[in-house]
């Protein structure tokens, strides 16, 4: 992983832009929500899914913003990036942000898990979905399917570790930006993403691994039993007029 320098720093140093919006490109905004009390950070990452590999193009990180105000920041930059599709972690304070963005600000391009169930805006992260997201993110990174350029995100990835049955930041570190990518990994490996974009991540990774295996296989050798050389000599003899005459005379003597 290699960090890049942002082309713009906005929102009083909380918003880092690495690439400007590209016309007709599709973007996904993934957000992790904190309480805004100076401890954990409310974050989001904007990811361009029209490029190969997918590319992180902007990051927001703030540990004092209220969940009541965070939807306004998301709304602002989701619109800037071609009405980005928003995937928000809905646990605890996350539901406040989900509902604020979807209902109060009437931003429709938000992931909704169920059209029937109440409070279904966003994605609820539990132990199972977190494990699946971590596994999917690992596959994306190992197979170069996502380009991470933000320095703080890379730092958090380096201190993200397994603890028991889950994954989290090592003692004294944060994982809020990593959780953006975990949420992204969980979503892009789902059937919903495949239907939404016609991009099947699992199939792409499987084909890449299969190709790598095929390239590593040593080709089977050929056994030279001399048959090719014998056939060549026979052809040469049949084309030699002296050889044909000798054969005829030999047959007559018999």
Give the predicted meaning of each segment.
Residues 1-115, 121, 131, 135, ...:
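RNase H-like, metal-dependent nuclease domains and their acidic two-metal-ion catalytic environment used
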């Amino acid at each position: 992983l290699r960090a890049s320098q942002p082309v713009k720093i906005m929102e009083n140093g909380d918003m880092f832009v690495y690439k400007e919006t590209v016309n007709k490109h599709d973007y996904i905004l993934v957000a992790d929500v904190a309480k805004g009390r100076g401890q954990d950070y409310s974050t989001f990452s904007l990811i361009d899914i029209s490029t190969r590999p997918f590319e992180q193009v902007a990051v927001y990180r703030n540990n004092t913003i209220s969940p009541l105000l965070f939807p306004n920041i998301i709304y602002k930059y989701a619109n800037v990036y071609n009405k980005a599709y928003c995937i928000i972690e809905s646990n605890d304070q996350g539901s406040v942000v989900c509902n604020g963005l979807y209902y109060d600000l009437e931003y429709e391009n938000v992931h909704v898990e169920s059209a029937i169930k109440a409070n279904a805006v966003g994605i609820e992260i539990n132990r199972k979905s977190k494990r699946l997201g971590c596994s999917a993110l690992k596959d994306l990174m190992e197979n170069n399917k996502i380009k991470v350029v933000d320095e703080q995100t890379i730092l958090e990835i380096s201190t993200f570790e397994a603890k028991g049955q889950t994954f989290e930041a090592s003692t004294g570190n944060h994982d809020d930006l990593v959780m953006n990518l975990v949420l992204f990994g969980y979503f892009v490996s789902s059937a919903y993403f495949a239907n939404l974009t016609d991009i099947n991540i699992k199939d792409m990774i499987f084909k890449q691994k299969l190709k790598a295996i095929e390239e590593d296989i040593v080709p089977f050798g050929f056994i030279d039993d001399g048959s090719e050389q014998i056939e060549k000599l026979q052809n040469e003899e049949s084309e030699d007029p002296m050889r044909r005459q000798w054969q005829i005379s030999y047959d007559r003597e018999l």
